[in-house]
Structures are given as C-alpha cells and as structure tokens.
Amino acid sequence: MTDNQENKPKKLTLSNTKLSLNKSFDSLASTQSFVNAKSKTLVEVRKSYSGSTTTLSLNKEKGSLETGSSSGSEEFNRRLSILKKAAEQSKLNDNSQISTLSKLASINQSIASQEDPIEVEQEESSDTNKVKEEPKIEEVKDIEESTLQTPKKKEDIFVKSPLVGTRTRYGIESEKTVDKVTENKVIAPKPKVEESRKFKKTDLFNMVGDDENDNRNRTRSLASIKRAREKEKRKSLVQAPEKVYREITLPEVIGVGDFANAMSERVSDVIKELMKLGILANASQTIDADTAELVATHLGHAVKRVQESDVENILITNDKEEDLRSRAPVVTVMGHVDHGKTSLLDALKSTDVASGETGGITQHIGAYRVTLADGRAITFIDTPGHEAFSEMRSRGAGVTDIVIIVVAADDGIKPQTVEAINHAKAANVPIIVAINKIDKPDIDIERVKNELYMYEIIGEEAGGDVMVIPISALKKINLDKLEEAILLIAEMQNLKASPFGSASGVVIESKIEKGRGALTTMLVQRGTLKSGDIIIAGTAYGKVKKMTNDKGIEVLEATPSVPIEIQGLSHVPHAGDMFNVVQTEKQAKDIAEYRERVAKEKKISIAPRSSLEDLFLKASGSSKIKELPLIIKGDVHGSVEAIAGSLLKLPNDEVKLRILHSGVGPITESDVSLAHASSAIIVGFNVRAGANAKTAAEKEKVEIRYYSIIYDLLDDVKAIMSGMLDPIIREQYIGSVEIRQIFNITKIGKIAGSYVTRGIIKKGAGVRLLRDNIVIHEGKLKTLKRFKEEVKEVREGYECGIAFENYEDIREGDTVEVFELIQEKKQL
C-alpha cells in the first residue's frame, strides 16, 4: 500500500503562495546564453498579449505572474484555456491592419519589462514529478503546434518574442526554457542595468516576417539598404550615356573645334574622321561646309546648311491689318540749281534755311516735318540740285511717297530737272510739278508746260495725270493749293504703317560733329524707334543714346514718317543705308563685320589690274600716266560722296586721280601724316583743320585747300590736273626756201645758196628737206647768213645761205620748209 501511494504522481506544490527569487534578476538577462550554468536551471515565463483590449488591460493590471496555492492541474487548465482563446482570436485578427503592430510591440515590451524571470532550483530526485507532468506538457505542446500551424498568408504578421527570439502569431504563447545543469550550481552573471530602449524602425523590421523558415534570420538594416542603393546609383552614373544625335547648322567655313562642339563630339574623333577623308587638320584650323557635312553625316548628325549672308536675315514679321495706322506722306523736293526748292520749303515751314546755305545751293539733304493748320503733317526731304548730287537725289526718290519737281518759270527745263524726272519715274512715285517764280515779270508758264511734254509730263488740263501748279515761294502764292494736292494724292495712296514692333527705316544723311560724335539723320518707315534701341545701319551699329527731331528738341521715340537725328553709332553710315533694330549688340556686330568683309572683297574685285608693262614703267620711274593723290574731308557723308563721284568722272587718260581717303569730320593729324607720306593734297569741304593738324601741315609742307562751294572745288582740281598734263606741241609753218647753188667751205661744210620764196626764215627754226615732194630730212637750221654775216631771219624775196645741223646731203633744186614748234597748255 505504502509503495503504491509513493509511486503515484504527486501534485506540484509551493511552500509559499508566491513564487519568488532570493536574488534580483533583470528581465533582459533572459537573452543571455546559459553555457556556464551547471547546477541551476533558469525558467522564464513571458506572456505576449494580442487580441481584444480587454485582455490586454487585464494582464496589464496584474503586472506579474501570479502563482497561488492552486495545484499544477489548475495551472495547466488555465494555460490551456488561454491558448485556445488565443488561437480563436488569431483567426479573427487575420485581416487586421498593420498599423496596430506598433501598438502591440510597445505593449509587449512593457509587459516583458514588468514580468520577473523565475529561477528555480530543482532537485535531481524530482524524476517522479516529471513523469507525472510529461503527459500534460505534451498536450500543451500539441495545442501550441496546432495554433502555430494555421494557414499563413502574406499579410500574416509575426511578433518576435523578447525572450528567446521565436516569433508567434497574434495570440498568447508562453515558453519555458529549461536547461539542465550539472551539480555545480553557477548563477548567470548579473547584466548591467540598461534603460528600456526606444522603439525604432529596425525593431519593426525585426518583428515582421514572411516565412516560418526565416524565424532565426535577421532583417537587413536601413544603413545596409541605403548603402546598396548608393552603390546602384553609382553604377548607373558610371554607365556610358546614350549618344544624342543633333541637327547642326553649318556655315560656309567652320573651325574644327567649333564643329566638334556643335555636335557634342570629341575633337579627336572629328580629326580621325577628317584623316579618313585625307584631310590633316587640328582644332584651330577651318574646314569648308562640304567636308563638315560629310563628317557630320558619318557621325549620325543631321546637317542644315546656311549661307554667310544669312546673318543679315533680320526677322520682320508681317504687320497685321488691325495694327496699321495712317501715316504722314513723305515728299521729296527736286529740281535744278537755284530754281527755288529750299525757298519753297522755307515758305511751307515758315523758317529761313536758305539764307544759311552757301552760294544759295543745298549742300546736303535736309528732312523736315511740317504740321498744317488742320493737324495733319507732311514730311519734306530737300535734295541738292547740283549734278554732283545725283546719288543723293536718287536716294531721296527711293524713300519718298510723292515727288515735287520745282521748275523756274523764267529758266525752264534744265539738265538736273530732267534727271529729277527720270529719278521719279524710276521710283514709280506720283509727280507734282511746281512752276516757281511766277511773280517775276516776262514769264511764260505755257512754254514750261510745253517743255514738260517732251519728257512725258502731261498736266491734268491736257488730259494727263500730273498736277502742274504755278507758285511763288517768295510771295507765298498758291502754297495752299500745293498742300491740298499733296494731301489729296496721299489720301488716294492710302498710306499706312504699323507703329508696333521693332523699327526700320532709311538713313537720310550722316555727319561727325565735334563733341557729339557720329550724327545720323534717319527716317522711320516702320515700327517705333526708341531711345536705347540697338540698331544696325550699313556697317555702323550701336545703341541710340539720344534722339532729336528736326526742330532740335530731344525726343524719346519716333513713329513712322518722322525724321530724327540720332547719336551713338560706331561711325557714320552711308546715306541711303537701311537701318534695323536688332535684339543684341553681338548680332549687330556680326552683321556689320559681314558687310565690311563683302564691301572689301567687292572693292578688291573692281580695282583695275596693272599690266606687266605698267609695272615695269612704274619700277623704272618712267610711267607715262601721272597720278594726283587726294584726301577729301567733308561735313556730311552725302557731300563727300558727291565730290568723290564728280572727281572720278574727270578724264584721266594722262593724269590719274587717286582718292587715298575720304571721310566725314575735321582734318586731323593722321590725315596730314597720310598726305605727307603719299605727297597728296588735302581738300576740306565745309571743314577746317585743327590746331595740331595745321602745325603738322606747316612742318611737313602739306597743302590743304578749303572750299565751301562744290563748283570751286571741282574747278581747282581740274586746274591742278591740267597743270600736270604734258603740253601740246604744235607745228607752225613760217616759210619756204628754194636751194639754187651748193658751196663747199673749208671747216664749215656745205652751204646752200637759197632764195626765200615764201614767208620768213629764222635761225634755229625747224626745217624739213623735200626732194621730189618727199621728205628727206627733218632737223634744225644751224647757220643763216646774208653776205657772210650771221642774221636772225631773212624775209621773202631775199637770198641767203643756210646749213643744216648734222646733215649735208643737199642738192640744187631741193625745197626746204621752215616751221616753229609752239607749246600749248593742255586742258582736261
């Protein structure tokens, strides 16, 4: 009996109501390894709570594992029921959101920190108790395994137990780690007390798993992931970029370096391609467009060919119909010299300009704007009438809307009048004929009209389309009719222009003024020119610094048909050049350089080429053609151009006129230096030399001539050229002699006894010996005697003795003609 009772399994009981430890034990010590433990067994009981908040709060209130005096079977039943509830609850929470993970993790950490690990010493003699407990433990393990083996989805989240690192699903799971130790009792070393760590993202990754087999694998840290991403990024940067094929613009000539940059290719690659074509070039050398196109095409790039002249393609958009506004007509006044053109303008604008002009003739173009009583405006351009200003008249006709041809009633049609008519017809503009000076007595207006018929200018009264208006500029007769005619024609033409956009127009005149630099008179034809705009006019460019109108008042902008004077250009442009507003100064500079290059090439191409004979004559100093070098300086470009054109038209078969330099502005020291080096004459038209230039001219003995009227200048230059011409040698017959007898005198030679049959014979005169009407000899008379005495001359009807220089082949019956050589000054 007793043995049977002893062999029965006994219930596990505790001496106290609470399970306690004699020594303190940190909860984190459970993670330590128990390799050194030999005589003691550490048991840690931790609970992981999940599910309803009621259960969690209940466990939190308890705060520790309660071990009462209940029996082991009650404890087993309690744990079993808790595990079953956890399994049921986990099924309900399979689709719970991952957002609750952070809350559960923090709760589990707080619970783990509150539970105390339990250290129990078990006696080796408790084998019987183990046998009793084994069936129950096996049953508990089966339930735990069934709970853990529930189907797992991707969204299943596992929580890592803080005790030994195993992961459990949401639910309650308790594990006991029992290590049998040897008899020698060794207590694990007490760990350092550490503060509870703050929850980090790495803890979140540690608590999340996708596979049961990854229970013991560690999750990659954020630093590792970051390093991997940086490595991938570096690899992508190291990879060669994809080649970009471009469309490049090729000029006629391009440098190899610029060509490579345009294609974004290495210069070495371009040079290799050129070497394949048999061209050896470095980065600084240039290649033609055809070669560049071959290389670019081979490298896969598209090519767009452009001409060098494309730099002048200044974009001007077409004006919209709604932007067009009515503008004032531009009227050009033409006619012969002194027919009253400027006086007519004086009467129209009530100013006295003619009195300030030398010789009563207009030396350069003037542009004026006249506002009538009704508010309408007319822009007048006055052109010179002298024949030297033909180019200026042609420019005036090219920019005008209406041409007024002034004809003096007492003088009629003159050469410049005909030229003005031809210019107007060539420009295809309406013509108004103003017969001026009708206030003079003894005039015949009908005679002037009949002369106009010869040039196809037919008045309206004769059935034509030309308005002929008799006026008097001095007495202001019929000026109102002239203005009405201008406005009527302008209204019929429907003159309009857009005041919007970039300005463009034409240069009327240009000059250099001391202290102000280059001054240019312009007529705006389109858009609005503003102060500060960058313009290009011919080869001159620059920013508009200041604008003044025809009355000398500074303005900030100029609209179409408004003449203005600007300053700010690099140099004076040519009259008649078109001006345009560009966006940048670089664009203006490129255009100006291209135009200068073209003008230089054109000048070289039209220069007369010297023959080989001329070069030899020039080298030997025996050139037959003489040369007159000139330097021309004037006040305005139009006058300088007119003077140069007139001088070059002079005959130059024997004297060649060479204009070394022509410019606008006063005579400078550089002009004097150039004249001294080339033995030239300086001609100043309405300009003077500065003090330094005068001193230099006196020192270098350079001739400077000043003029204010173009007639005087042309006449003087003609006289200088005429003086350089070789004189004309003319032969003048003075008499005839008949040889009647030949005398041989010792030491003298043959003497011809002669008789003067006609005229007179002089000693030293030229003689021509004729035999049978054939000239045998031509020379000079060496000896003239009468009765053994030397005489200067012998008249008709007298006898004399004559002898020739270096010639004695004379016979009786020969005839001698006597003549004189007369030099006459040659004129151009």
From Swiss-Prot:
A GO CC term assigned to this protein in UniProt: cytoplasm
Segments for region (G5): 472-474
TM helices/strands, residue ranges: none
InterPro entries with a match to the protein in the record: EF-G-like_DII (IPR053905), EFTu-like_2 (IPR004161), IF2_II (IPR044145), IF2_N (IPR006847), P-loop_NTPase (IPR027417), Small_GTP-bd (IPR005225), T_Tr_GTP-bd_dom (IPR000795), TF_IF2_bacterial-like (IPR000178)
Biased segments, Low complexity type: 65-74
Basic and acidic residues bias: start-end ranges: 127-137
Pfam short name (any one): GTP_EFTU_D2
Amino acid composition bias (Acidic residues), ranges on this chain: 116-126
Stretch list, region G3: 382-385
Keywords tagged on the record: Cytoplasm, GTP-binding, Initiation factor, Nucleotide-binding, Protein biosynthesis
Molecular function per GO: GTP binding; GTPase activity; guanosine tetraphosphate binding; translation initiation factor activity
Stretches the record annotates as Disordered: 48-76, 112-137
Compartmental location: Cytoplasm
Region ranges (G2): 360-364
Ligand binding (GTP): 335-342, 382-386, 436-439
G4: annotated segments: 436-439
Region (G1) residue spans: 335-342
PROSITE patterns assigned: G_TR_2, IF2
Residue ranges of every copy of the tr-type G domain listed in the record: 326-496
Protein biosynthesis keyword on record: yes
NCBIfam families assigned to the protein according to its UniProt record, in alphabetical order: IF-2 (TIGR00487), small_GTP (TIGR00231)
HAMAP family, A to Z: IF_2_B (MF_00100_B)
Function: One of the essential components for the initiation of protein synthesis. Protects formylmethionyl-tRNA from spontaneous hydrolysis and promotes its binding to the 30S ribosomal subunits. Also involved in the hydrolysis of GTP during the formation of the 70S ribosomal complex.
Family, per entry: Belongs to the TRAFAC class translation factor GTPase superfamily. Classic translation factor GTPase family. IF-2 subfamily.
The protein's name in its UniProt record: Translation initiation factor IF-2
Source species: Rickettsia bellii (strain RML369-C)
Lineage, top ranks: Bacteria, Pseudomonadati, Pseudomonadota, Alphaproteobacteria, Rickettsiales
